[in-house]
Protein backbone atom coordinates (compact mmCIF):
# COMPACT_ATOMS: atom_id res chain seq x y z
CA UNK A 1 0.00 0.00 0.00
CA UNK A 2 2.83 2.37 0.85
CA UNK A 3 4.52 1.58 -2.48
CA UNK A 4 1.36 2.44 -4.43
CA UNK A 5 0.86 5.61 -2.39
CA UNK A 6 4.45 6.75 -2.98
CA UNK A 7 4.22 6.06 -6.71
CA UNK A 8 0.99 8.00 -7.01
CA UNK A 9 2.42 10.89 -4.99
CA UNK A 10 5.37 11.09 -7.38
CA UNK A 11 3.00 11.28 -10.36
CA UNK A 12 1.00 14.06 -8.73
CA UNK A 13 4.20 15.95 -7.93
CA UNK A 14 5.33 15.84 -11.57
CA UNK A 15 1.85 16.98 -12.67
CA UNK A 16 1.97 19.91 -10.22
CA UNK A 17 5.43 20.97 -11.39
CA UNK A 18 4.19 20.98 -14.99
CA UNK A 19 1.13 23.00 -14.05
CA UNK A 20 3.19 25.49 -12.06
CA UNK A 21 5.67 25.93 -14.89
CA UNK A 22 2.86 26.45 -17.40
CA UNK A 23 0.78 28.87 -15.35
CA UNK A 24 3.45 30.69 -13.35
CA UNK A 25 0.84 32.12 -10.98
CA UNK A 26 2.04 34.21 -8.05
CA UNK A 27 -1.16 33.30 -6.20
CA UNK A 28 -0.11 29.64 -5.93
CA UNK A 29 3.70 29.73 -5.77
CA UNK A 30 5.28 26.42 -6.65
CA UNK A 31 7.88 26.74 -3.89
CA UNK A 32 5.20 26.70 -1.18
CA UNK A 33 3.34 23.85 -2.86
CA UNK A 34 6.41 21.62 -3.20
CA UNK A 35 7.49 22.04 0.42
CA UNK A 36 4.01 21.48 1.82
CA UNK A 37 3.39 18.55 -0.50
CA UNK A 38 6.49 16.77 0.81
CA UNK A 39 5.30 17.32 4.38
CA UNK A 40 1.94 15.84 3.42
CA UNK A 41 3.53 12.73 1.91
CA UNK A 42 5.71 12.35 5.00
CA UNK A 43 2.58 12.41 7.15
CA UNK A 44 1.01 9.69 5.01
CA UNK A 45 4.08 7.51 5.38
CA UNK A 46 4.20 8.10 9.12
CA UNK A 47 0.56 7.06 9.49
CA UNK A 48 1.02 3.90 7.42
CA UNK A 49 4.10 2.84 9.41
CA UNK A 50 2.95 3.82 12.92
CA UNK A 51 3.06 1.03 15.49
CA UNK A 52 1.29 2.89 18.28
CA UNK A 53 -1.73 5.15 18.56
CA UNK A 54 0.19 8.29 19.46
CA UNK A 55 2.47 8.12 16.42
CA UNK A 56 -0.62 7.50 14.31
CA UNK A 57 -2.08 10.67 15.82
CA UNK A 58 1.11 12.58 14.99
CA UNK A 59 0.85 11.38 11.39
CA UNK A 60 -2.73 12.63 11.21
CA UNK A 61 -1.74 16.03 12.56
CA UNK A 62 1.08 16.37 10.03
CA UNK A 63 -1.49 15.62 7.34
CA UNK A 64 -3.90 18.15 8.79
CA UNK A 65 -1.41 21.03 8.83
CA UNK A 66 -0.09 20.38 5.34
CA UNK A 67 -3.49 19.68 3.80
CA UNK A 68 -4.99 22.92 5.12
CA UNK A 69 -2.19 24.94 3.51
CA UNK A 70 -2.61 23.10 0.21
CA UNK A 71 -6.40 23.37 0.26
CA UNK A 72 -6.39 27.15 0.75
CA UNK A 73 -3.40 27.88 -1.49
CA UNK A 74 -4.36 30.81 -3.69
CA UNK A 75 -6.74 32.37 -1.19
CA UNK A 76 -9.91 32.41 -3.31
CA UNK A 77 -13.24 32.68 -1.50
CA UNK A 78 -14.28 29.15 -2.46
CA UNK A 79 -10.99 27.68 -1.25
CA UNK A 80 -11.10 29.55 2.04
CA UNK A 81 -14.69 28.41 2.61
CA UNK A 82 -13.81 24.81 1.77
CA UNK A 83 -10.70 25.04 3.93
CA UNK A 84 -12.69 26.25 6.94
CA UNK A 85 -15.11 23.34 6.59
CA UNK A 86 -12.21 20.93 6.27
CA UNK A 87 -10.26 22.27 9.24
CA UNK A 88 -13.30 22.29 11.56
CA UNK A 89 -14.21 18.70 10.70
CA UNK A 90 -10.60 17.52 10.89
CA UNK A 91 -10.00 19.20 14.25
CA UNK A 92 -13.15 17.57 15.60
CA UNK A 93 -11.80 14.20 14.52
CA UNK A 94 -8.37 14.94 16.00
CA UNK A 95 -9.78 16.02 19.37
CA UNK A 96 -11.89 12.87 19.56
CA UNK A 97 -8.90 10.72 18.58
CA UNK A 98 -6.69 12.36 21.21
CA UNK A 99 -9.35 11.88 23.88
CA UNK A 100 -9.62 8.20 22.92
CA UNK A 101 -5.83 7.82 23.19
CA UNK A 102 -5.94 9.33 26.69
CA UNK A 103 -8.67 6.93 27.79
CA UNK A 104 -6.87 3.96 26.25
CA UNK A 105 -3.67 4.85 28.09
CA UNK A 106 -5.53 5.39 31.36
CA UNK A 107 -7.21 1.98 31.06
CA UNK A 108 -4.27 -0.08 29.80
CA UNK A 109 -1.07 1.84 30.56
CA UNK A 110 0.16 1.71 26.96
CA UNK A 111 -0.57 2.96 23.45
CA UNK A 112 1.54 0.30 21.69
CA UNK A 113 -0.77 -1.57 19.32
CA UNK A 114 0.85 -4.96 19.91
CA UNK A 115 0.29 -4.62 23.66
CA UNK A 116 -3.19 -3.20 23.18
CA UNK A 117 -4.12 -6.25 21.11
CA UNK A 118 -4.01 -8.20 24.39
CA UNK A 119 -4.84 -5.63 27.07
CA UNK A 120 -7.95 -4.14 25.48
CA UNK A 121 -9.56 -7.59 25.48
CA UNK A 122 -9.20 -7.68 29.28
CA UNK A 123 -11.33 -4.55 29.76
CA UNK A 124 -15.06 -4.68 30.55
CA UNK A 125 -17.28 -4.88 27.49
CA UNK A 126 -18.74 -1.43 28.07
CA UNK A 127 -15.29 0.15 28.12
CA UNK A 128 -14.34 -1.68 24.93
CA UNK A 129 -17.47 -0.44 23.15
CA UNK A 130 -16.82 3.14 24.26
CA UNK A 131 -13.21 3.13 23.07
CA UNK A 132 -14.09 1.39 19.81
CA UNK A 133 -16.88 3.92 19.16
CA UNK A 134 -14.60 6.90 19.73
CA UNK A 135 -11.87 5.55 17.46
CA UNK A 136 -14.32 4.55 14.72
CA UNK A 137 -15.96 7.98 14.72
CA UNK A 138 -12.58 9.72 14.59
CA UNK A 139 -11.33 7.52 11.75
CA UNK A 140 -14.74 7.50 10.04
CA UNK A 141 -14.58 11.29 9.71
CA UNK A 142 -11.16 11.09 8.11
CA UNK A 143 -12.24 8.25 5.80
CA UNK A 144 -15.54 10.02 4.90
CA UNK A 145 -17.78 7.15 6.02
CA UNK A 146 -21.49 8.07 6.00
CA UNK A 147 -22.96 9.89 7.93
CA UNK A 148 -19.60 11.58 8.56
CA UNK A 149 -18.90 12.31 4.89
CA UNK A 150 -20.88 15.47 4.09
CA UNK A 151 -17.79 17.67 4.35
CA UNK A 152 -15.83 16.00 1.54
CA UNK A 153 -17.81 16.97 -1.61
CA UNK A 154 -17.88 20.59 -0.45
CA UNK A 155 -14.15 20.81 0.32
CA UNK A 156 -12.19 18.76 -2.21
CA UNK A 157 -13.49 20.26 -5.50
CA UNK A 158 -12.40 23.78 -4.52
CA UNK A 159 -8.68 22.94 -4.53
CA UNK A 160 -6.34 22.85 -7.56
CA UNK A 161 -6.29 19.58 -9.51
CA UNK A 162 -3.07 18.10 -8.03
CA UNK A 163 -4.17 18.93 -4.49
CA UNK A 164 -7.60 17.37 -4.97
CA UNK A 165 -5.99 14.33 -6.58
CA UNK A 166 -3.60 13.61 -3.72
CA UNK A 167 -6.33 14.27 -1.14
CA UNK A 168 -8.71 11.85 -2.85
CA UNK A 169 -6.07 9.23 -3.41
CA UNK A 170 -4.25 9.26 -0.08
CA UNK A 171 -5.91 11.13 2.77
CA UNK A 172 -9.16 9.18 2.91
CA UNK A 173 -7.21 5.91 2.57
CA UNK A 174 -5.21 6.77 5.68
CA UNK A 175 -8.52 6.86 7.52
CA UNK A 176 -9.51 3.50 6.01
CA UNK A 177 -6.13 2.05 6.99
CA UNK A 178 -6.66 3.22 10.57
CA UNK A 179 -10.06 1.50 10.62
CA UNK A 180 -8.42 -1.72 9.38
CA UNK A 181 -5.87 -1.60 12.21
CA UNK A 182 -8.56 -0.78 14.78
CA UNK A 183 -11.00 -3.49 13.75
CA UNK A 184 -8.51 -6.31 13.27
CA UNK A 185 -5.81 -5.68 15.85
CA UNK A 186 -7.56 -3.89 18.69
CA UNK A 187 -11.24 -4.90 18.50
CA UNK A 188 -11.60 -8.14 16.49
CA UNK A 189 -15.18 -9.36 16.49
CA UNK A 190 -16.30 -6.21 18.29
CA UNK A 191 -19.86 -5.30 19.16
CA UNK A 192 -20.01 -2.62 16.45
CA UNK A 193 -19.30 -4.85 13.43
CA UNK A 194 -22.95 -5.02 12.33
CA UNK A 195 -23.29 -1.25 12.67
CA UNK A 196 -20.20 -0.85 10.50
CA UNK A 197 -21.79 -3.07 7.84
CA UNK A 198 -24.84 -0.82 7.67
CA UNK A 199 -22.59 2.24 7.55
CA UNK A 200 -20.79 0.68 4.58
CA UNK A 201 -24.10 0.16 2.76
CA UNK A 202 -25.23 3.73 3.43
CA UNK A 203 -21.85 5.09 2.31
CA UNK A 204 -22.06 3.23 -0.99
CA UNK A 205 -25.63 4.20 -1.83
CA UNK A 206 -25.72 7.79 -0.57
CA UNK A 207 -22.40 8.57 -2.22
CA UNK A 208 -23.30 7.17 -5.61
CA UNK A 209 -26.76 8.76 -5.63
CA UNK A 210 -25.04 12.08 -5.00
CA UNK A 211 -22.65 11.38 -7.87
CA UNK A 212 -25.47 10.63 -10.30
CA UNK A 213 -27.13 13.94 -9.42
CA UNK A 214 -24.03 16.06 -10.15
CA UNK A 215 -23.38 18.09 -13.29
CA UNK A 216 -19.81 19.03 -12.39
CA UNK A 217 -17.02 16.54 -13.04
CA UNK A 218 -15.06 17.28 -9.86
CA UNK A 219 -18.11 17.07 -7.60
CA UNK A 220 -19.19 13.86 -9.31
CA UNK A 221 -15.77 12.33 -8.64
CA UNK A 222 -15.92 13.52 -5.02
CA UNK A 223 -19.20 11.69 -4.49
CA UNK A 224 -17.89 8.53 -6.18
CA UNK A 225 -14.93 8.74 -3.82
CA UNK A 226 -17.34 8.61 -0.88
CA UNK A 227 -19.35 5.75 -2.36
CA UNK A 228 -16.32 3.56 -3.03
CA UNK A 229 -15.06 4.04 0.51
CA UNK A 230 -18.13 1.96 1.30
CA UNK A 231 -16.68 -1.03 -0.55
CA UNK A 232 -13.57 -0.92 1.63
CA UNK A 233 -15.55 -0.61 4.86
CA UNK A 234 -17.73 -3.51 3.67
CA UNK A 235 -14.74 -5.83 3.50
CA UNK A 236 -13.39 -4.62 6.85
CA UNK A 237 -16.72 -5.07 8.63
CA UNK A 238 -17.09 -8.66 7.39
CA UNK A 239 -14.04 -9.51 9.47
CA UNK A 240 -13.20 -12.59 7.38
CA UNK A 241 -9.95 -13.31 5.58
CA UNK A 242 -11.68 -13.00 2.20
CA UNK A 243 -13.31 -9.70 3.14
CA UNK A 244 -10.08 -8.18 4.46
CA UNK A 245 -8.15 -9.35 1.40
CA UNK A 246 -10.71 -7.70 -0.87
CA UNK A 247 -10.58 -4.50 1.19
CA UNK A 248 -6.77 -4.32 1.12
CA UNK A 249 -6.67 -4.94 -2.63
CA UNK A 250 -9.42 -2.39 -3.25
CA UNK A 251 -7.63 0.27 -1.21
CA UNK A 252 -4.50 -0.09 -3.34
CA UNK A 253 -6.59 -0.09 -6.53
CA UNK A 254 -8.60 2.96 -5.51
CA UNK A 255 -5.55 5.01 -4.55
CA UNK A 256 -4.37 4.84 -8.16
CA UNK A 257 -7.76 5.15 -9.86
CA UNK A 258 -9.20 8.08 -7.94
CA UNK A 259 -5.97 10.07 -8.09
CA UNK A 260 -5.75 9.56 -11.85
CA UNK A 261 -9.34 10.63 -12.46
CA UNK A 262 -8.89 13.89 -10.56
CA UNK A 263 -5.76 14.66 -12.59
CA UNK A 264 -7.75 13.96 -15.75
CA UNK A 265 -10.40 16.38 -14.47
CA UNK A 266 -7.66 19.01 -14.24
CA UNK A 267 -6.72 18.37 -17.87
CA UNK A 268 -10.38 18.55 -18.89
CA UNK A 269 -10.68 21.94 -17.20
CA UNK A 270 -7.67 23.26 -19.10
CA UNK A 271 -8.88 21.87 -22.41
CA UNK A 272 -12.53 22.83 -22.06
CA UNK A 273 -12.36 25.87 -19.80
CA UNK A 274 -14.68 24.32 -17.19
CA UNK A 275 -15.56 21.10 -15.38
CA UNK A 276 -19.29 21.61 -15.84
CA UNK A 277 -20.52 18.71 -17.95
CA UNK A 278 -23.29 20.88 -19.42
CA UNK A 279 -20.72 23.37 -20.75
CA UNK A 280 -18.37 20.80 -22.26
CA UNK A 281 -18.52 19.10 -25.62
CA UNK A 282 -16.38 17.67 -28.38
CA UNK A 283 -13.35 16.89 -26.21
CA UNK A 284 -12.76 13.56 -27.94
CA UNK A 285 -12.43 15.28 -31.32
CA UNK A 286 -10.15 17.97 -29.96
CA UNK A 287 -7.93 15.68 -27.88
CA UNK A 288 -8.27 11.92 -28.48
CA UNK A 289 -5.51 11.24 -25.95
CA UNK A 290 -7.48 13.05 -23.25
CA UNK A 291 -10.48 10.88 -24.09
CA UNK A 292 -8.41 7.73 -23.61
CA UNK A 293 -6.94 9.05 -20.36
CA UNK A 294 -10.47 9.48 -19.00
CA UNK A 295 -12.02 6.33 -20.44
CA UNK A 296 -9.56 3.77 -19.01
CA UNK A 297 -9.69 4.76 -15.30
CA UNK A 298 -13.41 5.61 -15.54
CA UNK A 299 -14.23 2.10 -16.71
CA UNK A 300 -11.91 0.73 -14.04
CA UNK A 301 -13.76 2.72 -11.39
CA UNK A 302 -17.07 1.32 -12.65
CA UNK A 303 -15.72 -2.22 -12.41
CA UNK A 304 -15.79 -3.25 -16.06
CA UNK A 305 -14.08 -6.64 -16.57
CA UNK A 306 -11.26 -7.54 -16.74
CA UNK A 307 -9.93 -4.40 -15.04
CA UNK A 308 -8.68 -4.34 -11.45
CA UNK A 309 -11.83 -2.61 -10.23
CA UNK A 310 -13.87 -5.61 -11.39
CA UNK A 311 -11.48 -8.02 -9.67
CA UNK A 312 -11.61 -6.12 -6.39
CA UNK A 313 -15.40 -5.83 -6.40
CA UNK A 314 -15.89 -9.50 -7.26
CA UNK A 315 -13.59 -10.45 -4.39
CA UNK A 316 -15.59 -8.33 -1.95
CA UNK A 317 -18.95 -9.57 -3.22
CA UNK A 318 -17.79 -13.20 -3.02
CA UNK A 319 -16.70 -12.58 0.56
CA UNK A 320 -20.15 -11.21 1.35
CA UNK A 321 -21.88 -14.22 -0.21
CA UNK A 322 -19.58 -16.59 1.68
CA UNK A 323 -20.40 -14.85 4.97
CA UNK A 324 -24.02 -15.79 4.34
CA UNK A 325 -25.94 -13.45 6.65
CA UNK A 326 -28.92 -11.36 5.57
CA UNK A 327 -26.96 -8.16 6.18
CA UNK A 328 -24.10 -9.42 4.02
CA UNK A 329 -26.46 -10.31 1.17
CA UNK A 330 -28.00 -6.84 1.45
CA UNK A 331 -24.55 -5.31 1.08
CA UNK A 332 -23.80 -7.53 -1.90
CA UNK A 333 -26.94 -6.19 -3.60
CA UNK A 334 -25.96 -2.65 -2.63
CA UNK A 335 -22.49 -3.18 -4.08
CA UNK A 336 -23.94 -4.32 -7.41
CA UNK A 337 -26.30 -1.31 -7.54
CA UNK A 338 -23.45 1.05 -6.68
CA UNK A 339 -21.30 -0.37 -9.45
CA UNK A 340 -24.08 0.04 -12.02
CA UNK A 341 -24.78 3.62 -10.94
CA UNK A 342 -21.06 4.38 -11.09
CA UNK A 343 -21.10 3.21 -14.69
CA UNK A 344 -24.09 5.48 -15.35
CA UNK A 345 -22.33 8.50 -13.82
CA UNK A 346 -19.08 8.11 -15.76
CA UNK A 347 -20.89 7.15 -18.98
CA UNK A 348 -22.87 10.38 -18.85
CA UNK A 349 -19.65 12.38 -18.57
CA UNK A 350 -18.14 10.34 -21.40
CA UNK A 351 -21.04 10.91 -23.79
CA UNK A 352 -21.70 14.56 -22.97
CA UNK A 353 -18.25 16.01 -22.37
CA UNK A 354 -16.33 13.98 -24.93
CA UNK A 355 -18.73 13.06 -27.73
CA UNK A 356 -21.56 15.59 -27.70
CA UNK A 357 -21.32 18.28 -30.36
CA UNK A 358 -20.72 21.72 -28.82
CA UNK A 359 -23.75 23.03 -30.66
CA UNK A 360 -25.91 20.71 -28.52
CA UNK A 361 -24.81 22.41 -25.31
CA UNK A 362 -27.69 24.40 -23.79
CA UNK A 363 -25.44 26.85 -21.98
CA UNK A 364 -25.01 29.46 -24.68
CA UNK A 365 -28.69 29.65 -25.56
CA UNK A 366 -29.65 29.82 -21.88
CA UNK A 367 -27.13 32.56 -21.16
CA UNK A 368 -28.15 34.57 -24.19
CA UNK A 369 -31.83 34.25 -23.32
CA UNK A 370 -31.18 35.34 -19.74
CA UNK A 371 -29.16 38.34 -20.91
CA UNK A 372 -31.86 39.33 -23.39
CA UNK A 373 -34.58 39.01 -20.75
CA UNK A 374 -32.57 41.15 -18.35
CA UNK A 375 -32.07 43.77 -21.05
CA UNK A 376 -35.80 43.94 -21.76
CA UNK A 377 -36.70 43.96 -18.07
CA UNK A 378 -34.38 46.89 -17.28
CA UNK A 379 -35.01 48.91 -20.42
CA UNK A 380 -36.41 52.35 -19.62
CA UNK A 381 -39.88 52.88 -21.01
CA UNK A 382 -40.49 55.87 -23.27
CA UNK A 383 -42.86 56.95 -25.98
CA UNK A 384 -41.28 54.45 -28.35
CA UNK A 385 -38.32 56.69 -29.15
CA UNK A 386 -34.95 55.77 -27.62
CA UNK A 387 -32.68 58.56 -26.49
CA UNK A 388 -29.01 58.63 -27.35
CA UNK A 389 -28.18 57.35 -23.85
CA UNK A 390 -30.66 54.52 -24.17
CA UNK A 391 -29.26 53.59 -27.55
CA UNK A 392 -25.77 53.56 -26.08
CA UNK A 393 -26.98 51.33 -23.22
CA UNK A 394 -28.62 49.00 -25.70
CA UNK A 395 -25.44 48.87 -27.76
CA UNK A 396 -23.44 48.11 -24.64
CA UNK A 397 -25.79 45.29 -23.70
CA UNK A 398 -25.60 43.88 -27.19
CA UNK A 399 -21.81 44.01 -27.11
CA UNK A 400 -21.77 42.20 -23.77
CA UNK A 401 -24.11 39.51 -25.09
CA UNK A 402 -21.97 39.07 -28.19
CA UNK A 403 -18.82 38.81 -26.07
CA UNK A 404 -20.45 36.19 -23.85
CA UNK A 405 -21.55 34.15 -26.86
CA UNK A 406 -18.05 34.29 -28.31
CA UNK A 407 -16.60 33.19 -24.96
CA UNK A 408 -19.02 30.26 -24.73
CA UNK A 409 -18.32 29.24 -28.30
CA UNK A 410 -14.60 29.16 -27.60
CA UNK A 411 -14.99 27.29 -24.31
CA UNK A 412 -17.14 24.58 -25.90
CA UNK A 413 -15.67 24.42 -29.37
CA UNK A 414 -14.80 21.02 -30.81
CA UNK A 415 -12.20 22.35 -33.23
CA UNK A 416 -8.98 24.05 -32.11
CA UNK A 417 -8.90 26.30 -35.18
CA UNK A 418 -12.08 28.21 -34.37
CA UNK A 419 -12.00 31.47 -36.31
CA UNK A 420 -10.98 34.29 -33.99
CA UNK A 421 -13.45 36.97 -33.10
CA UNK A 422 -12.67 40.45 -31.91
CA UNK A 423 -12.91 40.69 -28.15
CA UNK A 424 -13.29 36.92 -27.67
CA UNK A 425 -12.27 35.62 -24.25
CA UNK A 426 -10.28 32.43 -24.89
CA UNK A 427 -10.72 30.25 -21.80
CA UNK A 428 -8.91 27.28 -23.29
CA UNK A 429 -5.31 26.55 -22.37
CA UNK A 430 -2.93 24.08 -23.99
CA UNK A 431 -2.08 20.85 -22.22
CA UNK A 432 1.58 20.92 -21.10
CA UNK A 433 3.49 17.76 -21.91
CA UNK A 434 4.58 17.30 -18.30
CA UNK A 435 0.99 17.24 -17.05
CA UNK A 436 -0.13 14.88 -19.81
CA UNK A 437 2.91 12.66 -19.27
CA UNK A 438 2.33 12.34 -15.53
CA UNK A 439 -1.34 11.51 -16.06
CA UNK A 440 -0.48 8.98 -18.77
CA UNK A 441 1.99 7.30 -16.42
CA UNK A 442 -0.67 6.96 -13.73
CA UNK A 443 -3.15 5.55 -16.26
CA UNK A 444 -0.46 3.02 -17.18
CA UNK A 445 -0.16 2.22 -13.46
CA UNK A 446 -3.89 1.46 -13.28
CA UNK A 447 -3.52 -0.88 -16.25
CA UNK A 448 -0.51 -2.51 -14.58
CA UNK A 449 -2.62 -3.17 -11.50
CA UNK A 450 -4.90 -5.23 -13.73
CA UNK A 451 -2.00 -7.18 -15.21
CA UNK A 452 -0.53 -7.82 -11.78
CA UNK A 453 -3.86 -8.48 -10.07
CA UNK A 454 -3.01 -12.12 -9.35
CA UNK A 455 0.23 -11.50 -7.44
CA UNK A 456 -1.23 -8.41 -5.76
CA UNK A 457 -4.29 -10.31 -4.59
CA UNK A 458 -1.95 -12.96 -3.23
CA UNK A 459 -0.21 -10.29 -1.17
CA UNK A 460 -3.60 -9.02 -0.01
CA UNK A 461 -4.55 -12.56 1.09
CA UNK A 462 -1.33 -12.83 3.07
CA UNK A 463 -1.94 -9.44 4.68
CA UNK A 464 -5.49 -10.48 5.59
CA UNK A 465 -4.23 -13.68 7.21
CA UNK A 466 -1.71 -11.72 9.27
CA UNK A 467 -4.40 -9.23 10.29
CA UNK A 468 -6.67 -11.97 11.60
CA UNK A 469 -3.91 -13.95 13.36
CA UNK A 470 -2.25 -11.32 15.53
CA UNK A 471 0.48 -13.60 16.85
CA UNK A 472 2.97 -12.98 14.00
CA UNK A 473 2.65 -9.23 14.51
CA UNK A 474 3.13 -9.30 18.27
CA UNK A 475 6.03 -11.75 17.89
CA UNK A 476 7.76 -9.48 15.38
CA UNK A 477 7.37 -6.52 17.73
CA UNK A 478 8.54 -8.17 20.96
CA UNK A 479 10.61 -11.08 19.64
CA UNK A 480 8.51 -13.57 21.59
CA UNK A 481 4.92 -14.77 21.76
CA UNK A 482 4.71 -13.44 25.32
CA UNK A 483 3.34 -9.89 25.29
CA UNK A 484 4.76 -7.80 28.17
Placement of each model-derived feature along the sequence:
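Hydrophobic H-region at the start of alpha-helical membrane spans
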Residues: 2-4, 90-94, 436-440
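Cytoplasmic/organellar membrane-interface segments at the starts of transmembrane helices
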Residues: 277, 284-289, 346-484
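Short phosphate-coordinating micro-motif centered on Lys-Gly-acidic
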Residues: 61
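Hydrophobic transmembrane alpha-helices and their helix-loop junctions in integral membrane proteins
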Residues: 11-21, 42-54, 67-314, 318-342, ...
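Core segments of transmembrane alpha-helices
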Residues: 5-6, 171-175, 312-313, 438-443
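Cytoplasmic juxtamembrane regions at transmembrane-helix boundaries
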Residues: 15-31, 163, 365-369, 424-434
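Transmembrane helix-loop-helix hairpins at membrane boundaries of multipass inner-membrane proteins
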Residues: 1-35, 114-115, 462, 466, ...
Amino acid sequence: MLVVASTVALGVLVFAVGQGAADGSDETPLSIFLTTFRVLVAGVGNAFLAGDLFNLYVGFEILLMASYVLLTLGGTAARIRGGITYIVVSLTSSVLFLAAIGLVYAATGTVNMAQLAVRLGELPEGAQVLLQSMLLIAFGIKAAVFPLSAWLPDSYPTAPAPVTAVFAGLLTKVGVYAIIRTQTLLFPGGALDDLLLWAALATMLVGILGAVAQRDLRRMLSFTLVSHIGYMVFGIALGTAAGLAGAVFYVAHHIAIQTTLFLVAGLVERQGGTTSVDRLGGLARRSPLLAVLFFVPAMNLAGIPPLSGFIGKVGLLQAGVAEGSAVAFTLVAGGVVTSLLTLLAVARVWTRAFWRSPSQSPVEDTAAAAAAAAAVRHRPESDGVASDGEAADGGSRTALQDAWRRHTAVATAAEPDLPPAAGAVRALRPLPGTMVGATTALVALTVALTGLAGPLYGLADRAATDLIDRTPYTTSVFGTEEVP
